[in-house]
């Protein structure tokens, strides 16, 4: 079934604009690692690539929505100059394209695998929506909790936003490739860990712009609310602690996967965040 010519023109424009924005499109290195994972699990390369295309459109849609709601740069002068309704429509169009790609893929997968992939996709989209809602409604001034409650709430937010997106990326590639539940679960959980790390990492790098948004819940603010201002570590110390702990969790999570899959994921993580961390020597 072909789209009407006008629809084709609109969709081509959406793809063109989002793909040329380094801010809104996932890096090629990520997509290459996802493909290596799927193929290493026995997936058909063309089918794995189609899932990655669908995920990329979904990821761009969520990034665009997030940047619009936060007033952040869009990475494309033409898109930035458009009216707000049209900018939001680009996010909707990217989401529509993602679902169209997914439908094309699931139509050729084995029926049971197709159903599982669609369930993973839909449950993840619900998580992303919930995470974005919490990001918009949770206020930093409400983090004056006792103990580690503020950090727990921030961790839940990270899991529902970027964590869920990467759980779908890796889990979806695995689901496209194999019917082995243990492999799909390992890939999905690894994606969750990587996505949460990315949320933390970007948050700590984005401190300057966050100063203009005092009510935005950030890792540093959640850390200070839980640990106490006087005891708060420097940002580099916070990252070192988190990276080491999540790396250890990731290493254990990857155990069921074959060596090529483990290598693809560990190389991806080190490309994103730097060399494997040293053992933890700092205590909270």
What are these regions (language model features)?
Residues 261-284:
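Short, amphipathic C-terminal "tail helix"
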């Amino acid at each position: 079934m072909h789209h009407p010519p006008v629809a084709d023109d609109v969709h081509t424009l959406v793809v063109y604009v989002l793909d040329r924005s380094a801010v809104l499109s996932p890096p090629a290195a990520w997509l290459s690692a996802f493909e290596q994972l799927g193929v290493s699990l026995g997936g058909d390369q063309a089918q794995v690539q189609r899932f990655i295309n669908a995920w990329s459109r979904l990821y761009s849609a969520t990034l665009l929505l997030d940047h619009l709601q936060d007033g952040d740069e869009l990475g494309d002068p033409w898109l930035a100059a458009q009216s707000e309704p049209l900018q939001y429509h680009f996010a909707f169009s990217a989401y529509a394209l993602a679902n169209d790609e997914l439908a094309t893929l699931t139509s050729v997968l084995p029926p049971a695998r197709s159903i599982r992939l669609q369930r993973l996709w839909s449950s993840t989209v619900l998580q992303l929506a919930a995470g974005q809602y919490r990001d918009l409604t949770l206020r930093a001034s409400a983090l004056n909790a006792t103990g580690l409650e503020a950090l727990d709430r921030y961790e839940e937010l990270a899991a529902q936003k970027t964590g869920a997106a990467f759980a779908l990326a890796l889990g979806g590639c695995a689901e496209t490739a194999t019917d082995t539940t243990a492999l799909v679960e390992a890939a999905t959980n690894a994606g969750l860990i990587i996505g949460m790390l990315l949320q933390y990492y970007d948050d700590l790098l984005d401190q300057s712009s966050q100063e203009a948004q005092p009510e935005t819940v950030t890792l540093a603010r959640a850390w200070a609310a839980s640990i106490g201002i006087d005891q708060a570590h420097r940002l580099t110390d916070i990252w070192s602690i988190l990276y080491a702990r999540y790396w250890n969790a990731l290493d254990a999570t990857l155990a069921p996967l074959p060596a090529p899959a483990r290598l693809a994921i560990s190389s991806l993580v080190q490309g994103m965040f730097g060399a494997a961390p040293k053992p933890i020597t700092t205590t909270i």
